[in-house]
Amino acid sequence: MAKISKRVQALRAKVDRNRIYPVAEALALVKECATAKFDESIDVAVNLGVDARKSDQVVRGSVVLPAGTGKTVRVAVFAQGDKAEAARAAGADVVGFDDLAEQVKGGTIDFDLCIATPDAMRVVGQLGQILGPRGLMPNPKVGTVTMDVTTAVKNAKAGQVQYRTDKGGLVHATIGRASFGVEALQQNLNAFIEALVKARPAAAKGVYLRRVAVSSTMGAGVRVEPTTASA
């Protein structure tokens, strides 16, 4: 069994694993535990009361975090004509159509998020085996297949995060950095939880927000009261 470092032991000692914390206190504690030499990400994990093995209970979508994510996102847009110009004007880093598809096929993928107009999907669809495994395939459910490329690009640049339940009904997202203030992190967490609540499937039964926990990249997880997380 691998030894647990003194640093990790000290971090774990600060967190009462049997306690469910109010959100502001939990976020302050997570920030206190973020002692790495880099600006750690602050993440949330939410266990939802859904059977994600059933297609009608998969929770998927996107939300713009009001305080941003602290990360610079490079955005690619597959579009032509006026839509291509609109994407460039909105701040897209890479814009193209067949030429961009050829770049991707050649192994040049210098972007973090991909947006496409509906007519471009005939080209993008051929890139599924390349973009899919990287989580870059545009999808209308998260707003990345759209005619409104201006809004899509601006949202991506402003701090939009995408989410989807895994097979166990768990959703993960980054809601900021350790350098963020507690208030900014709380605003982002509230926005994320509200988005999950709005996306609740009609087929979901019983308690929906079963467990909410926040953590930093290298820190311990801290459970949060679901009611205060969405207050």
Swiss-Prot record:
Give a GO molecular function annotation for the protein: rRNA binding
InterPro entries of this UniProt entry? Ribosom_uL1_bac-type (IPR005878), Ribosomal_uL1 (IPR002143), Ribosomal_uL1-like (IPR023674), Ribosomal_uL1/biogenesis (IPR028364), Ribosomal_uL1_3-a/b-sand (IPR016095), Ribosomal_uL1_CS (IPR023673)
**Superkingdom in the source lineage:** Bacteria
Q: Which Pfam families match?
A: Ribosomal_L1 (PF00687)
Q: What cellular component GO annotations does this protein have?
A: cytosolic large ribosomal subunit
UniProt keyword list: Repressor, Ribonucleoprotein, Ribosomal protein, RNA-binding, rRNA-binding, Translation regulation, tRNA-binding
Q: Which GO terms describe its biological process?
A: regulation of translation; translation
Supply the CDD domains for this chain: Ribosomal_L1
Entry keyword Nucleotide-binding: no
Keyword rRNA-binding listed? The answer is: yes
What does the annotation say about its assembly with partners?
Part of the 50S ribosomal subunit.
Please give the family membership noted in the entry: Belongs to the universal ribosomal protein uL1 family.
Function recorded in the entry: Binds directly to 23S rRNA. The L1 stalk is quite mobile in the ribosome, and is involved in E site tRNA release. Protein L1 is also a translational repressor protein, it controls the translation of the L11 operon by binding to its mRNA.
Q: What is this protein called?
A: Large ribosomal subunit protein uL1
Source organism of the structure? Azoarcus sp. (strain BH72)
